[in-house]
Amino acid sequence: MKEKAESSVACNHHKVGFLGLLVTLGIVFGDIGTSPLYVMKAILHTGESISESTILGALSCIIWTLTLQTTIKYVCVALRADNNGEGGILALYALLRRLKYKWIYLLAIIGASTLLADGIITPAITVTTAIEGLESISPNLPVIPITLGIITIIFFVQRFGTESIGKSFGVFMLLWFLLLGVVGAFSITSYPLILKAFNPYYAAMLLAKSPEWFLILGAVFLCTTGAEALYSDLGHCGRKNIAISWGFVKTMLILNYLGQGAWVLNHADTALAANPFFAIMPQSMLFFAIIMATGAAIVASQALISGTFSILSEAMNLHFWPRMRIKHPTHVKGQLYIPMINLAMYIGVVLIILLFRDSSHMEAAYGLAITITMLMTTLLLGFYLHSKGVARIFTMLFMGAYCIIEAIFLTANLSKFLAGGWCTMLIGGILFLMMYVWVKAMKIRRHYISTKPLDDYYQIISDIKADESIPKYASNLVYVNHANKEGAVDDKLLYSIINKQPKRADHYWLINMEFVDTPDTLEYNCETLIPDTLYSVTMHIGFRIEPRVSLYLRQVVEDLVADGKVDLQSTYPSLRKYGIPGDFRFIIIHRVYYPESSDNRQQNLLMSIYALISKIGIDEPKALGLDTSMVVVERVPLIINHPVIKDKVIKVINDSETSQSRQ
């Protein structure tokens, strides 16, 4: 007998309309929308002399980078590579992990690690640059303390959720982009020839002739760092809303970049002393522009923090990261808060600000890690296109073209390594090591779980239930079954029921958890193995769904009771006459690794690191969403390749030898 619950609500795709487009502006484009704050300033500080050919070439590079990277790769191609409406590098990997290429997970964890590392510096550089605009009004203003204060507030409010203020993000970002476009267009009128930058000839000439081309490309790349976040936010807004909004956003961005370029050419002698973004603002609007820039930086930071929580939540369900405590501060679908990650990010951002002190130095650390993320996304997109039967020639051209483009950007950004890029690469390297060790250790743990055919034990389980000489352990006894074979059961689970302390119960429940490739699936199958005694419940959980076994099992039980397929009333007469249901108790089998159980040094080292990493997570009962007052954890050793004992450790002494020794 099998029963199946209805799937959870599918991904919430907003319909195309003004409201949907407005929400998209507030959620998706914060990162890429704040890039005009620092891109042109970074280009001017590469050391290249300011001339018309240099500025036209740099602007042409910006326009065509936005076109090739953001428009074609992400909006036209990547947004179509959705996993039931969800996007991002881990959602893309979830579509591909069943392929024959078992090493493909490396691309996903490299990309996720560098994306998370880059996220540490984004709030620092955007907020710092915005506050630095105040120096044009008050040169002695303490930028660092103000920046740290704003950053502290941003991270502090995460615990309360951002539902109330989040609704206004879209309106604010609409005003922000209009400000960018209008001010930029006004500045263009002072140097109309700046429009020649649309011609890619100027980009080609700059790259061919400038000795500082790699430094300029490293600065230009900052204009598209938010493209990966655009893909990750696909599930929040839908492809059409993002694509339509991008047309507006791109236009406003290009107008602003061109306006900054026009100002630079009109003020070539003094351009290095100012930030072109604030310089093109009319003096009467400067303070307003600084307030708007600070607000946009806050929106970008908020989107990035929320994105980090979502990425790590996905990583947990894909077994890339240890389970951590997740809170839901509001009723908004998908809004998460991970306290430990919030604290770690806050400390990281504060250290970045204190280490680099100003946005010019932060620019040197920015962009290197995200280039690697984009390269990994390109490779995964290539596998995706191939798996969907896209023409081989198109797939090869796509992968080849973008691997070359991103390899060039990576080479250019490597010039930033000693100047600050080492920081994000170090963070990314640590995160990659943690994910890699976690994946390998989980494989080892699964490999050494011994299983047995469950149907061989039906009779003994029935006999234990009927044997009233055994004290009743619980009315309903629930185990999480870690066997990954159909019809099999973890042998330590059987040992717990039968050998360790025979556990008599009215009903035995075996919970099998299967994390599926789709994001929002939440289904179950329930099979009665022994009528009115043993049940097997398989929960199919999407990679964006948080496991909450107690809640899900309650629904399963209620469904079965409603259908008259199980009687959960207490068997004790004094309780049954009042309609009181039987109690539930959960048994968790926790395997403890002992280095002595293996003579493989490499494996011992890996499992030792795994043990350290697991300390940042929560224990299995909390990870599964169980009521800890109803849980018993039984610890058993994880035996791995125990070395064969060739010689007896303890010698048997016969009676004659004993008597002789006593004499």
Question: Where does each model-flagged region fall?
Answer:
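The structured alpha-helical core of multi-pass membrane proteins
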Residues: K2-Q663
